[in-house]
Amino acid sequence: MGVYIPPGSGGNDNGKSGGSGDNTLTIPNPASFIPQNPSLGLRLWGPLVPASDNLPALYFLTSLQIGIGLLSFNKVRYLRRSNLARFGIENTWQRRSTKWLCAIGGSYLVYQSGIEMSRLAMPYDPWYDEAKFYRKLAIKNGDNPSWWFGATGYYKPMNYKEWYTKIDKWFNNQINIIDAEHENVDTASSQVSTRGKHPQSPLLSSLSRKGKYSEIYQSLHESNIKRYKKLLDQSLKDVNELNKAERLDLIMEGKSSIKYNEEYLKPHIQLGNHRIDTDEEFEMVWLNFEPWDELKMETDYDIRLVPRWRWSEDEDVEASSTESVPTEPTTNLVNEVDESHI
């Protein structure tokens, strides 16, 4: 958001040419400097709400709000037992209004704190994932985001409606997953007990919800076992370290069944020895290596702007105007000048 200040009525100020100056002044919105971290039960704190991925700060602020609510309840008990004469509140109406105000305020603070604690106890929080992602992005770009407020300048947090939609979708998925696990737990256990199958990785076991992915994995595993047994028994039967030099010579001379591809270039993308069995490990590998950035750096591309039409109308107008200019007055003028000199 900005404010546009138009130039003066004279166009050029102090005789300066307007071609080199820029009269546009952009004033940033002051609200953009105020952190706007989302929350369910800490809205009373306004811009002091910490980032959604800063769990220690959220727990501290929630505990502080609960403490203020409990102090309000203690104030209500104190007002009930004392006559409040020493505080200058001798009127019964003032005493009752103060008591009810403390009771309502304390109840509201404790209730809001309970809502916030329930959000922090949830295993999935879209606000947490969003704040954590942009904090990592800011650190990767060389910035130092605030420990309390997070990377507020990199994104605008999602609103409550979008957050609620994602939470509702996640709950429905979890319900479907639990129902599917209860239905297939007996069949899966019987299959594993009868067949001595290869154990699944944690990532694959998390994907095998209704048995589809586990069946695909088992079929691929069995086909791979058959393939490498066939290779070891047939084409790779005589392959060992003793005849390695001889085999390499035959490959380089082109006399082997294995052909050497001289145009092959080894890809630059290397993931190292990192495991990606869990979502956290996969996210760490993806953020550190960024395969799409590697591919973008190794891809050469040219951009050419080709016009879709030719501006022939102006050229035709100029040509017709030059043809229609008469040349006789010019020749007469030259003759008159020559006669005057004579």
Curated annotation (Swiss-Prot):
Location(s), subcellular: Mitochondrion inner membrane
Identify the stretch(es) annotated as Disordered: 1-28, 317-342
Segments in the Mitochondrial intermembrane topological domain: 1-56, 118-342
How does the protein associate with the membrane?
Answer: Multi-pass membrane protein
Task: Tell me where on the tree of life, at the top rank, the source sits.
Answer: Eukaryota
Give me the stretches of Low complexity compositional bias.
319-331
* Pfam families in alphabetical order: Mgr1
Q: Which UniProt keywords apply?
A: Membrane, Mitochondrion, Mitochondrion inner membrane, Transmembrane, Transmembrane helix
Ranges of Gly residues composition bias in the record? 8-21
Give the transmembrane ranges: 57-73, 100-117
**InterPro entries per UniProt:** i-AAA_Mgr1
Residue ranges, Mitochondrial matrix side:
74-99
**Biological function:** Component of the mitochondrial inner membrane i-AAA protease complex required for mitochondrial inner membrane protein turnover.
Share what the entry says about its subunit structure, partners included: Component of the mitochondrial inner membrane i-AAA protease complex.
Q: Which family does it belong to?
A: Belongs to the MGR1 family.
Q: What is this protein called?
A: Mitochondrial inner membrane i-AAA protease complex subunit MGR1
- Report the source organism: Debaryomyces hansenii (strain ATCC 36239 / CBS 767 / BCRC 21394 / JCM 1990 / NBRC 0083 / IGC 2968)
